[in-house]
């Protein structure tokens, strides 16, 4: 698989700036010759706005519903996302799990729906700080793997330690590797990316971890300059 760099814009930005950001980012990536796939996951309203702005950038979404259609006010199906040009969809992000009480089983249903619609789900899992401090890291990760992952189809695993999301704190390389080893004991084939406080300063250390296929970037993806620095940094490490 190509080096995968995913931007999760969460609920930031506005309709006027989405396309200009995408065009500027695309122009900055013209000279990147490495085998890298850049994915933008904007708010739903921007999906149709940016899909044609940059042929060298893939479009993703931040969530989907597990039914393909029906009387589900306010929901967006994976089939709809595919029809507007999405290639990926994030499911199971901790903010969805904690704020909207999405269970592992709900995440699995969403992932299955995404696969059936022709999308590649990016399934987020990760431990809390309490899990790690109480010696429950392995149980926490394996429970999420078993209950969140579909049994068939292609998907990407996003390892995001809950305590690193939205912070300036990133786990040590040894801590990340320990978690990846646990995940790999359950799934030896799917690509794994890392998310949680990824920025220009730590990208080279993170992407140098052999088991990783890329990164999921939050706040540092909201500015073209910082996001490009992350992409360039990751590419440079993988090319050397």
From Swiss-Prot:
* Primary localisation category: cytoplasm
What broad class of enzyme is this? isomerase
> Annotated pathway, please?
Carbohydrate biosynthesis; gluconeogenesis; Carbohydrate degradation; glycolysis; D-glyceraldehyde 3-phosphate from glycerone phosphate: step 1/1
Instruction: Supply the CDD domains for this chain.
Output: TIM (cd00311)
The record's keywords, sorted A to Z, are:
Cytoplasm, Gluconeogenesis, Glycolysis, Isomerase
Q: Name one GO cellular component term.
A: cytosol
Superkingdom assignment: Bacteria
Q: Which cysteines are joined by disulfide bonds?
A: none
Ranges in a coiled coil: none
Molecular function, one GO term: triose-phosphate isomerase activity
GO process terms (BP):
gluconeogenesis; glyceraldehyde-3-phosphate biosynthetic process; glycerol catabolic process; glycolytic process
Q: Which InterPro entries match?
A: Aldolase_TIM, TIM_sf, TrioseP_Isoase_bac/euk, Triosephosphate_isomerase, Triosephosphate_isomerase_AS
Keyword Isomerase (UniProt): yes
In this protein, the active site sits at: 93 (electrophile), 160 (proton acceptor)
Reaction(s) catalysed (UniProt annotation): D-glyceraldehyde 3-phosphate = dihydroxyacetone phosphate
Tell me where in or outside the cell this protein is found: Cytoplasm
EC number from the UniProt entry: 5.3.1.1
Q: Which residues bind substrate?
A: 8-10, 166
Q: How does it assemble?
A: Homodimer.
Q: Which family does it belong to?
A: Belongs to the triosephosphate isomerase family.
HAMAP family (alphabetical): TIM_B (MF_00147_B)
So what does this one do?
Involved in the gluconeogenesis. Catalyzes stereospecifically the conversion of dihydroxyacetone phosphate (DHAP) to D-glyceraldehyde-3-phosphate (G3P).
Protein's recorded name: Triosephosphate isomerase
Query: Which lineage?
Result: Bacteria, Pseudomonadati, Pseudomonadota, Alphaproteobacteria, Rickettsiales
């Amino acid at each position: 698989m190509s080096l995968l760099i995913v931007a999760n814009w969460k609920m930031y930005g506005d309709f006027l700036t989405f396309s200009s950001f995408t065009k500027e980012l695309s122009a900055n990536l013209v000279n990147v010759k490495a085998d890298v796939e850049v994915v933008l996951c904007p708010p739903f309203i921007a999906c149709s706005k940016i899909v044609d702005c940059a042929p060298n950038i893939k479009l993703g979404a931040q969530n989907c519903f597990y039914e393909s259609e029906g009387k589900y006010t306010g929901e967006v199906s994976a089939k709809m996302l595919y029809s507007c040009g999405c290639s990926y969809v994030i499911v199971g992000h901790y903010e969805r799990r904690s704020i909207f009480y999405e269970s592992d089983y709900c995440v699995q249903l969403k992932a299955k729906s995404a696969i059936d619609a022709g999308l590649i789900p990016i399934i987020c899992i990760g431990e809390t700080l309490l899990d790690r401090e109480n010696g429950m890291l392995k149980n926490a990760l394996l429970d999420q793997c078993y209950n969140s992952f579909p049994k068939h189809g292609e998907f990407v695993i996003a390892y995001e330690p809950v305590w690193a999301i939205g912070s300036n704190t990133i786990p040590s390389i040894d801590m990340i590797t320990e978690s990846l080893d646990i995940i790999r004991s359950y799934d030896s084939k799917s690509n794994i990316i890392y998310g949680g406080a990824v920025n220009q300063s730590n990208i080279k250390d993170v992407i140098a971890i052999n088991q990783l296929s890329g990164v999921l970037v939050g706040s540092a993806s909201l500015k073209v300059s910082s996001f490009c620095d992350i992409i360039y940094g990751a590419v440079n490490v993988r090319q050397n």
